């Protein structure tokens, strides 16, 4: 079929450019240092291409995205990068893909309780680093980690998203450093081996 014969609307991917982008990002963040976000591509085929390049850890914004990745066998290390209080959805995810390693973001006692009730075993403490959307204030990160551990959860570390800086045109590098300093401070309170942050718009500025 020729491209002009495709029914529209149609999503067309230039595989040569895609592979070049994967290789470029992988050179900066090799292997599991890069955690691709499923909401950006919503395709298990593309996820498999990333996994074949060594990027076997993924995150998603919804329970459904994680379930889709796990169903495709891409379940080594999945992060639900969103705070969920719907216990039923969490329980359905855990029960549906029992072999998957699933980590959930938490930022409050309520989300910690939901994680426990939903059968989640591991969490990251989500920290607000400048974008007023979600995440605890950095000074509360240690307290929340203690609460999560007291409830029997494994706390793997912290996550934060400097989304407000993705298109910043003035002093982006300095502002990214400020945001990441908040995340690193929170990690100092929380511990763990994961510090998750960054995005396409700031990846060249993140050197932590």
Task: Please name every model-derived segment.
Residues 41-43, 63-64, 83-85, 107-111, ...:
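Active-site beta-loop-alpha junctions enriched in small/polar residues
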Residues 33-35, 56-57, 77-79, 101-103, ...:
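Structural preference for beta-strand elements that scaffold enzyme active sites
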Residues 18, 39, 69, 115, ...:
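Conserved, mostly hydrophobic/aromatic
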Residues 21, 25, 46, 65, ...:
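A general structural detector for well-ordered alpha-helical segments in enzyme core domains, enriched
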Residues 46-50, 70, 89-94, 112-120, ...:
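Distinct, well-ordered alpha-helical segments
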Residues 120-122, 128-208:
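Active-site loop/helix belt of alpha/beta enzymes
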Residues 1-95:
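A charged N-terminal "starter" segment
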Residues 79-80, 86-133:
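A generic, well-ordered mixed alpha/beta core segment in the N-terminal half of proteins
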């Amino acid at each position: 079929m020729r491209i002009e014969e495709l029914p529209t609307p149609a999503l067309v991917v230039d595989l040569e450019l895609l592979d070049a982008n994967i290789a470029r990002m992988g050179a900066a963040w090799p292997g599991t240092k890069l955690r691709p976000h499923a909401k950006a591509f919503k395709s298990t085929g593309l996820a498999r291409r990333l996994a074949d390049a060594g990027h076997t850890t993924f995150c998603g914004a919804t329970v459904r995205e994680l379930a889709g990745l796990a169903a495709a066998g891409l379940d080594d290390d999945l992060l639900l990068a969103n705070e969920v209080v719907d216990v039923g959805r969490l329980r359905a995810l855990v029960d549906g893909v029992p072999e998957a390693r699933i980590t959930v973001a938490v930022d409050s006692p309520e989300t910690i309780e939901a994680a426990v009730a939903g059968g989640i075993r591991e969490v990251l403490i989500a920290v607000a680093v400048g974008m007023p959307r979600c995440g605890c204030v950095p000074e509360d990160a240690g307290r929340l980690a203690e609460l999560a551990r007291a409830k029997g959860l494994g706390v793997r570390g912290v996550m934060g998203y400097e989304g407000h800086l993705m298109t910043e045109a003035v002093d982006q590098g300095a502002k990214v450093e400020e945001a990441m300093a908040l995340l690193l401070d929170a990690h100092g309170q929380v511990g763990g081996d994961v510090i998750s942050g960054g995005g396409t718009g700031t990846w060249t500025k993140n050197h932590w």
